[in-house]
From Swiss-Prot:
Positions of post-translational N6-(pyridoxal phosphate)lysine modification: K720
Quaternary structure and partners: The glycine cleavage system is composed of four proteins: P, T, L and H.
Keyword flag Oxidoreductase: yes
Its EC number(s): 1.4.4.2
Residue ranges of coiled coil: none
UniProt cofactor(s): pyridoxal 5'-phosphate
NCBIfam families in UniProt: gcvP (TIGR00461), PRK04366.1 (NF003346)
Protein name: Glycine dehydrogenase (decarboxylating)
Domain of life: Bacteria
One cellular component term from this protein's GO annotations in UniProt: cytosol
Catalytic activity: N(6)-[(R)-lipoyl]-L-lysyl-[glycine-cleavage complex H protein] + glycine + H(+) = N(6)-[(R)-S(8)-aminomethyldihydrolipoyl]-L-lysyl-[glycine-cleavage complex H protein] + CO2
Biological source species: Cupriavidus metallidurans (strain ATCC 43123 / DSM 2839 / NBRC 102507 / CH34)
Keyword Oxidoreductase applies: yes
UniProt cross-references to InterPro entries, sorted A to Z: GcvP (IPR003437), GDC-P_C (IPR049316), GDC-P_N (IPR049315), GDC_P (IPR020581), PyrdxlP-dep_Trfase (IPR015424), PyrdxlP-dep_Trfase_major (IPR015421), PyrdxlP-dep_Trfase_small (IPR015422)
Amino acid sequence: MNAPLPMNAAAQGARPTLAELEARDAFAARHIGPDSAEQQHMLKVLGFESRAALIDAVVPAAIRRRDGMSLGEFTAPLTEEAALGRLRALAGKNRVLKSFIGQGYYNTLTPGVILRNIFENPAWYTAYTPYQPEISQGRLEAMLNFQQMITDLTGLDIANASMLDEGTAAAEAMTLLQRVNKHASNTFYVAEDVLPQTLEVVRTRALPLGIEVKVGPAADAAQAHAFGVLLQYPGVNGDVADYRAIAEAVHASGGRVVAAADLLALTLIAAPGEWGADVTVGNSQRFGVPLGFGGPHAGYMAVKDEFKRSMPGRLVGVTIDAQGNKAYRLALQTREQHIRREKATSNICTAQVLLAVMASMYAVYHGPQGLKRIAQRVHRLTATLAAGLKTLGHTPLNATFFDTLTLETGFNTDAFHASATARGINLRHVDATRIGISFDETASRDDVIALWEIFAHGKAVPDFDTIEASVQDGFPATLARQSAYLTHPVFNTHHAEHEMLRYLRALADKDLALDRTMIPLGSCTMKLNATSEMIPVTWPEFSNIHPFAPLDQTVGYREMIDQLEAMLCAATGYAAVSLQPNAGSQGEYAGLLIIHAYHASRGESHRDICLIPSSAHGTNPASAQMAGMKVVVVACDENGNVDLADLAKKAEQHSKNLAAIMITYPSTHGVFEQGVQQICDIVHKHGGQVYVDGANMNAMVGVAAPGQFGGDVSHLNLHKTFCIPHGGGGPGVGPVAVGAHLADFLPNQDSVGYRRDENGIGGVSAAPFGSASILPISWMYIAMMGSAGLTAATENAILTANYVARRLSPHFPVLYTGQHGLVAHECILDLRPLQKATGISNEDVAKRLMDYGFHAPTMSFPVPGTLMIEPTESEALHELDRFIDAMIAIRGEIARVEDGSFDREDNPLKHAPHTAAVVVSDKWNHKYTREEAAYPVASLRTQKYWPPVGRADNVYGDRNLFCSCVPLSEYAED
């Protein structure tokens, strides 16, 4: 695989055949970075003659895949052009109608400057979560803008940097209130007019936690004596209710209030924080993010200040750098799941950063007046529609409204829907006798007239201008918003496109993403996100489809989804896949709920013990806790492998109640454990199920399959193994794959009519197919690689990791290796001995790498004081060597600390990264030169990345928590 590109014969002087000239470039040769010669060079360094020989030495023979991994019609790879053509044909089977369905999803107009310069820009979509703040200042600022936008519009004190969707945000709000409110009740009360998909996600979350969800009129909320109450604002049927008295009564009963609020409506109606909401959640989709058949979209959560340390997800804060300048960073990280582990109450990692950035920039571009004008237009058209419908004998059931009307249609509902569809319009099917209409920023007076004609029954429609001139607001004046919002200069400056374009460019220039350099983060798989894979995402046939559109309008989507599910089954060896989970954390959670449902179906619902190795990622114990399981930790031996004796002991001890074990394979230590089948056998012997975390699947596709060596269920990370970009912290897709015996329990979304099986668990995401619009990325990758290409990618991922480990091992100890001293697809460098000898920490090395133009490897996971490196198959030998040379040079700098030629405190590592401002300053008091600081290797003279800030002060940032946009005065001081 990865043979030289066509024309090789001609390049050597031979006359190419016509067949060679007609051959299109194989995509695998574009995706896999090292060419054949470079692969042979690396193999020679490792002492192997072929990739096959290397894989034989790395992967245990007992689990090696020998079946060729048939992908059916996609076994042979398609060219980029052919794959795009095949997918275009599927997209053409979808029908794009104007959807006035609403129910939390709306048509929107994405400004071209945002579409081209964020959504389609690899500087934004190939970045990783901003754990290294010094090289992430651009998107941290954009995320802070999002937080400011949310706090302003909701009237609350602090917001996080996005949630997975509105349903998940509401479920997280429920568990947050249960945690912080010491109320005797175990009841969460949900108003009957919440979005139905939100209610289902809340119920799914509540069930394993023993929370009772009661549904009823909002007016009865206080009588429920619940610890929390969820109110929709406006309601799903359009009502804009005054909740002040209800919120006061709930508070008097000891409860707390969650508002699920529409951001555009909040530009006109009173903010939830002003009428008593303690938490506000929702979706920012209508701020410029396409429908996408349900996602990805950035949910949000805002809370009162007293709840900030209990809030899930990422939180961006302001701090200072080493020179005292302002800087942004992720704040309060000690509350997150990867640190709290089984004590966590949420497993949310990063969520939907790319989409949050888009939504925030929509607000930046339009500004407060622009948003208000859009909202006023939507509301005016809705009011005009309502007034005209009244003249035609259709008085809306909701007396108040912002953008949504609900009509009683008797038994003519189907006829009205058919008439609307014939005009290219989708309406909401409420039930057999009611129809909903929700307007958005794409609505026009022509749409109003068309809807009048649909409901006219042959009557003459009224004159638009006459009706419009007399309409009044659809909500009471007492609910009209009085408070200002989006007053910060960032929302009042960049309205001209040139200004917006340059602002986005300035932010992107501050960051390091894959468009500039390799990102060698272990356990993150920062591989190529090929342009051809990204192109279909913005096709209208994929991006402009409502998630609840009629089935006959989404035929192409469903065929593509069916094909992708089959591809993933082939890759994993499992029998069935659900694409609903919209993050790896949600895939984990779904998998454990499936295991619980399976045990319950066999009369063994008492099985609630989840065994988890001590080396596991923090999401594993957090997910187990969310699924209602009790975590029992299994020890690992000195080589990082699961201690089989300890496993056997604990499996025996908990045999009657054993639900599952969660293992990662290859292990989080970067090796293929020899005893994985024994692990599976031990757990199965005691009635448990085996959950194989798919975070490291990039080391197994085509080589080994968890569904074949003993796994019962896995989640995958399409944003790792299957090329969906990380987006700076989302979006992601975390499909859950299961064996045949678990297939009946895959998630439904009954609230919107999506049911796989009557035994399926409830919805874990708001939309039936989660982040559907980015699924074409993985479809394209698999179709273009084919079976052999995917296998070659895996083999090269293992090859590059071992090459890096071998070349760096004389300089840094490689902490764990498998058989024959080899690693899987990543390696861990142990810096603890160096820190003990010199005081130089893994953080110092990480920050120094920025001066060399690199993103740091993963720090202190899974072992404190280490760096974990995953180079992936997409990096060419030149880039691998550039990184290796940088690490060796840094080791040389550490040696100078050891021998005393560098001061232990005043050296280039302790003061890294070095900004341009520091290097050119008249003041230079360091005991090393400016050249040693800025240009440690000669190659940097021709291509140099300058970090925009010095080392961020984490302690200062958490002690002086500030999570809103910096006042203008601060910019003046800079």
